[in-house]
Amino acid sequence: MDIELFLSNYNIANGTSSTTANNSKFQPKIKVKLVVESGSSTYEKSLESTNDQLKPLIIKLNNKIKKYEESLNKKNFVTPNKQSSSSMNLLQKSSTVNLSSPSLSQIGLTHHASLKNLQITTSPDIQQPPSVPSNPIVFGISLDTLIAKEKSMELRIPTFVSNILNTLFLHSLGVEGLFRISGSQMEIQNRRGIVNLGDYSTSRDDNPHVLTVLLKQFLRDLPEPICTNALYDLFLAASDQINFQQCKENGFEVLKKLINSNLPVNNRNLLQHLIHFLRFVAMNQTVNLMGPSNLSRVFGPNLFWKKETGPLDIQILQSTSEKVNFITEQMILHYDTLFEEPLQTTSPAVLSNTPINSNPASIPTFNFGGKKLVIHSKLLGHNKSIQWMTLCGSSNSNGNSELSGSRVWSLDSHGMARIWDSQNQQFIKEVEVVDQSKGGGGAVYQMISTTVNNTVWTATSQKLAIWDIDGGLIGEIPGESYSLCESQNKEIWVGGPQVLNIYSLDGIPSIAPSNCTSDDNNSNGAGGGELLKPIGTNLFMKGIIILAMCKVGQNRIWGCSSEKTLYVWDTKTKETIHQCEIQEKRPKRMACIEIDDTEYIWIGGDEGSIQIFNSKTFKLEHKILNQGWDKIFHIASINREIWIGFWDTTVRVFPGDPKNKEILIDYKGYHSDVVSSIIEVPNLKGGDPFVWFGSYDKSISIVSIKEDTAKSWNFTNIKKNFTRPIRQGFSSRG
């Protein structure tokens, strides 16, 4: 019998027998078996328990199997034969219609009235079946006709295009030769036939080169180009002006007017979606080798063309092609100034009836609490999942830190750290923190930067290492370290095996020895210079490993242990002033936030529950149970709010005040995997501040936060006697 029958019978039984369901002792035992048959051999594993305990596992396995079956069915499509109606009917019957991916404008935020009113967000990878239009053909149809026949008024570009852009955005920005390399012609023709039958769905399993060819074919098959026949010559004239220095500024004004005032609304929306996406591709040209110039050459001819009625002049054709490429390149390079935000994604009639505070934008811009989140950049380059990020600045003449020349370090699970310029988001260099050639490699636990001498500290299974902000190795202490925290007294507290090591920052230089730079030690973390080996004070904790720490108030450090114990230490006397049991199996994440002169410590871990403690009373103020989001991967305090990354790939923002139990926002869609690190980065140019998200999908997304002009942005983590944010000692990645 099918497993669906068991699930339906269970639901009926559960609805009529609540007393039994609530008492597992009276429930009959069931067994789940995994059987693998390979040749003549059979392998199996079984698990026995009650209905209630095993039902979530059964549902999860059943959903995964169904999803995989759909993927296999999708790959087994055949090319439809126009001369055979029977084969066409067979194809229609066997096609599996999946959910179309949401557009970048619809990715992932669900506002909440309270925790009690949970709403289900749709993952970009989990798609619901769309209703197939009566005439589902996509290729060769005018843009206005195509959009008019789609029932949804929220999305003002074709669903087929939106799905391709989102799948490429989530999974393929780093693919070498994106839009330049072609896919298999047979696969392209198969997929084109499927699309014209109404299946517009895409997934991470799709060949990105097939998707890019389909997108270019769609644009070339339009009866009229996106930039229209009527405006073709005007766009080329704007290209000439921009290319001529004396009238360059006027040329950009002409181009901006052509885009925002002269183009039909549907054409403008689609053009902005496309250029917006190409901008993200170009940002990662060091990885995909597709910069603005290369992209303009392969994409420009799909945006601009004009049907010639007479014989072609090769010289004129070459000159025109150069202008088309140039104007496309300029749109990619100057996207932010040429395109008006927000992009209109609803019809004018619908837009006029929407509330003033709504924001129907195609670029993901999300409003909450008087703020607007807008994606600014997406950075690639890591080959493994990102575990930690930290912001560090440069030291001034007094030895204090300042943000000028600041860096962001991102550290992946393979022990490779990439260093970025925090302001222009440009990659600077890569440093090997863990020597993977030694003893099978090592594990990464935590990374922080200090506010006193602006050094970067990394805790791994091999050693505790100290770096300058540019990747020079200053010193190291052999042995495993799990958690890090900078105290209020110019010290670094390090959680090791059954011991707390405390190192003074006095005497530790902020710059590595000249003969021991990261260039000298990029293979094994050791150069020719004499490395510092600081000696610390030890607080022995028999049988205890501190998994997470954070500093609180003027002289407190709070920490959570592997034995589910919460500790509070006095940083001056080094004494334990409070100790209690915490109801969390593996408390690995901590953050502190100050609300109305009281500091609250937020703690989470593998169980997915959130516990909020009052720093004055040491009492549990509030507990938020796991609402189905599973493990907690990061907790950060940003602008009077708590930002938490969960296993379900969602970042949820909570008000810092535990009395307010609402979830302000569910932020999801810029990553295909868990967000494992969150940091705030001020904008030194005086613009909107940034939040950086590091993910297990090996990428970093950077969101700018536009604050309501009536309110002022408050950097929660800026230390009052310093000019830059401090680093929280969140936790180890044990």
Swiss-Prot record:
Swiss-Prot/TrEMBL induction comment: Down-regulated by phagocytic stimuli.
Ranges where the Rho-GAP domain occurs: 141-339
Xref: SUPFAM superfamilies: GTPase activation domain, GAP, Quinoprotein alcohol dehydrogenase-like
WD repeat feature ranges: 381-430, 539-579, 585-623
Gene Ontology process terms (BP): small GTPase-mediated signal transduction
Protein function: Rho GTPase-activating protein involved in the signal transduction pathway.
Protein name: Rho GTPase-activating protein gacL
